[in-house]
């Protein structure tokens, strides 16, 4: 992953001790690249799945906790996808292919 200074093309300096930290931040803000200031969010948003997992409804009642899954009646068997139709007397049926169509 690229560093912040390589992305924006400006140097990022760190203050050596806490007494000089306020002065270093002030000078750094003035010399930011084109007036840009990079700040981190103090309260980043959750991604959608994490948000839904955190805010999902909980089972708080005893009747909800002990609830079993619903039992449904079994489904009837499905009809076949294909039905092969064979004439009663397949040996006497005369099959002639259709004549070819002339192409233009």
Curated annotation (Swiss-Prot):
<dbReference type="Pfam" id="PF17257">
    <property type="entry name" value="DUF5323"/>
</dbReference>
<feature type="region of interest" description="Disordered">
    <location>
        <begin position="42"/>
        <end position="76"/>
    </location>
</feature>
<comment type="subunit">
    <text>Part of the 50S ribosomal subunit.</text>
</comment>
<keyword id="KW-0934">Plastid</keyword>
<keyword id="KW-0150">Chloroplast</keyword>
<feature type="compositionally biased region" description="Basic residues">
    <location>
        <begin position="44"/>
        <end position="60"/>
    </location>
</feature>
<keyword id="KW-0689">Ribosomal protein</keyword>
<dbReference type="GO" id="GO:0019843">
    <property type="term" value="F:rRNA binding"/>
</dbReference>
<dbReference type="GO" id="GO:0009507">
    <property type="term" value="C:chloroplast"/>
</dbReference>
<dbReference type="InterPro" id="IPR020526">
    <property type="entry name" value="Ribosomal_cL38"/>
</dbReference>
<feature type="transit peptide" description="Chloroplast">
    <location>
        <begin position="1"/>
        <end position="39"/>
    </location>
</feature>
<keyword id="KW-0687">Ribonucleoprotein</keyword>
<keyword id="KW-0809">Transit peptide</keyword>
<comment type="similarity">
    <text>Belongs to the chloroplast-specific ribosomal protein cL38 family.</text>
</comment>
<dbReference type="GO" id="GO:0006412">
    <property type="term" value="P:translation"/>
</dbReference>
<dbReference type="GO" id="GO:1990904">
    <property type="term" value="C:ribonucleoprotein complex"/>
</dbReference>
<protein>
    <recommendedName>
        <fullName>Large ribosomal subunit protein cL38</fullName>
    </recommendedName>
</protein>
<dbReference type="GO" id="GO:0005840">
    <property type="term" value="C:ribosome"/>
</dbReference>
<dbReference type="GO" id="GO:0003735">
    <property type="term" value="F:structural constituent of ribosome"/>
</dbReference>
């Amino acid at each position: 992953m690229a560093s912040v200074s390589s992305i924006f093309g400006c140097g990022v300096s760190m203050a050596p001790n806490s007494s000089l930290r306020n002065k270093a931040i002030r000078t750094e803000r003035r010399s930011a690249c084109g007036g840009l200031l990079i700040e981190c969010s103090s309260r980043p948003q959750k991604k959608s799945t994490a948000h839904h997992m955190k805010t999902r409804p909980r089972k708080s009642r005893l009747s909800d906790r002990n609830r079993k899954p619903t039992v449904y009646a079994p489904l009837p068997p499905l009809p076949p996808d294909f039905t092969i139709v064979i004439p009663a007397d397949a040996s006497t049926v005369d099959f002639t292919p259709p004549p070819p169509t002339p192409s233009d």
